[in-house]
């Protein structure tokens, strides 16, 4: 998980290791839920989705070791003790916000709606320290610029938004400051003519 996501949900290295184990143990493979698999005609069974894995995790943390083998057709995930309630709650919140973001990005709409949805999704999933808040403003300016370059009369799909944002999010070239007395770290290609 990136730093801003870790900060938003209070995740440390031990939490990430535990989450990785849970993902493996619960059989999560791909797809947020059955609806996310529908375009691939694989929405018959929920097993292997993030939603089903989360259900197993939630049942595992709430049912004791000698409890029922299934609750509502869901087998509890083993080795999820009551001491993990806080982490399970944070994982549940993270996945709920991802699900909300996916819902926002599912429908065609004007560019301004897309940029608002992207901003809301990013802000709900991330938190940056005060000295790095400029990144939030930079994101909003970049998305605003992209929205101004598109017509609000034409509904856009996700693929259209990707194309619209490709140039906006591409890296910006900077002027090289070779031989200015400072330390220059680069690949050999820019310095190939220097003896």
For every predicted segment, state its role.
Residues 1-195:
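Polyanion-engaging groove/track-forming segments
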């Amino acid at each position: 998980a990136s730093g801003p996501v870790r900060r938003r949900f209070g995740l440390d290295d031990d939490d990430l290791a535990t989450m990785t184990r849970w993902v493996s143990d619960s059989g999560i493979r791909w797809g947020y839920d059955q609806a996310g698999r529908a375009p691939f005609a694989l929405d018959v069974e929920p097993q292997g989705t993030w939603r089903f894995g989360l259900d197993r995790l939630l049942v595992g943390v709430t049912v004791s070791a000698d409890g029922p083998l299934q609750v509502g057709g869901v087998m509890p995930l083993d080795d999820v003790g009551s001491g993990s309630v806080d982490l399970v709650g944070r994982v549940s919140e993270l996945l709920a916000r991802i699900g909300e973001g996916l819902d926002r990005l599912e429908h065609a709409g004007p560019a301004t709606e897309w940029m608002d949805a992207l901003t809301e999704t990013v802000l709900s999933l991330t938190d940056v320290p005060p000295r790095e808040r400029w990144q939030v403003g930079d994101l909003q300016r970049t998305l605003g610029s992209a929205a101004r370059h598109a017509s609000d009369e034409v509904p856009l799909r996700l693929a259209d938004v990707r194309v619209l944002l490709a140039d906006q999010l591409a890296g910006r070239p900077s002027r090289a400051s070779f031989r200015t007395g400072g330390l220059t770290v680069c690949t050999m290609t820019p310095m190939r003519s220097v003896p």
